[in-house]
């Protein structure tokens, strides 16, 4: 006797078009935060009277913050609600855009860019939300491809728009544009997506988040400093790497003790876990 399982039906356009609009708007908002500013860096130097190194540091701060927030926000979304977390991310990112837009100096700009980094895990969170609402495998694969392709770049339009805005209205107009899109994303995600959580929602492992964030932050900063080669402060690189190792050691020990770990120790002991993480880390470091 054979049994057949029917594949879930595809969503109708009236259902998936609003959903995709909301998710793509959120992805657009993050992508603009990441790439739209690149053509405006020289303009920022002139208007703020800053050096190339200072402006470059603000970019590094954004991407480092994005990486750190990506460690725990998707998991937090599993526990308290993915839509709630994504809406909060977009709202905070919009606030960061406003701070950056009105920044009188590089120090305030740096703070604004760090706040904007909260949007870092936008894409994985959007893909999880998409999976929760699109149950048909074929349709999900197609829509997933659309979302991830947008994250790879908006056909160069983001860079061209950033260059045009900075050239005609100053670099602050770029941040105001980002803020508007983040605000639109807040409304779209709240209206057009459904709330979802994991099947089980235990307490968030904040004890594990802290040492892991410190460890990864130190390692990323060390790699960034080492990338300067002859101009690098190698003593600082060594200190940061040592702190990173200590942070990972603390994270390992915390995860062995908590009831609901951020990453189960059983996974940390598997070679395939470290092979995947190492490959990803080295690849992105090369980029």
Roles of regions detected by a PLM:
Residues 13-33, 37-41, 52, 56-61, ...:
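12-transmembrane solute porter fold
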Residues 60-74, 124-128:
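Central cavity-lining transmembrane alpha-helices of secondary-active solute carriers
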Residues 67-104:
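Conserved MFS/SLC helix-loop-helix module at the cytosolic interface between two early adjacent transmembrane helices
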């Amino acid at each position: 006797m054979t049994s057949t399982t029917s594949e879930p039906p595809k969503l109708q356009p009236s259902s998936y078009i609003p959903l995709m609009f909301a998710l793509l708007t959120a992805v657009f908002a993050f992508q603009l935060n990441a790439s739209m500013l690149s053509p405006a860096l020289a303009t920022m130097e002139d208007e703020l009277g800053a050096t190339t190194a200072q402006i470059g540091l603000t970019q590094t701060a954004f991407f480092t913050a994005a990486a750190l927030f990506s460690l725990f926000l998707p998991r937090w979304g599993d526990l308290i609600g993915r839509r709630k977390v994504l809406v909060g991310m977009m709202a905070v990112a919009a606030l960061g855009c406003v701070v950056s837009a009105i920044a009188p100096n590089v120090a305030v700009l740096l703070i604004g860019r760090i706040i904007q980094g909260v949007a870092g895990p936008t894409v994985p969170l959007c893909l999880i939300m998409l999976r929760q609402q699109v149950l048909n495998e074929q349709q999900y694969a197609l829509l997933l491809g659309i979302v991830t392709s947008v994250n790879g770049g908006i056909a160069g339009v983001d860079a061209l728009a950033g260059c045009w805005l900075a050239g005609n209205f100053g670099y602050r107009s770029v941040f105001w544009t980002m803020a508007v899109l983040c605000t639109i994303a807040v409304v779209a995600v709240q209206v057009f997506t459904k709330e979802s959580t994991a099947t089980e929602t235990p307490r968030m492992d904040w004890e594990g988040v802290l040492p892991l964030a410190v460890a990864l932050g130190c390692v990323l900063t060390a790699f960034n400093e080492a990338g300067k080669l002859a101009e690098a402060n190698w003593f600082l690189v060594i200190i940061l790497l040592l702190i990173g190792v200590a942070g990972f050691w603390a994270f390992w020990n915390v995860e062995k003790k908590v009831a609901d770990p951020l990453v189960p120790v059983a996974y940390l002991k598997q070679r395939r876990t470290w092979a995947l993480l190492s490959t990803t880390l080295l690849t992105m470091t090369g980029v």
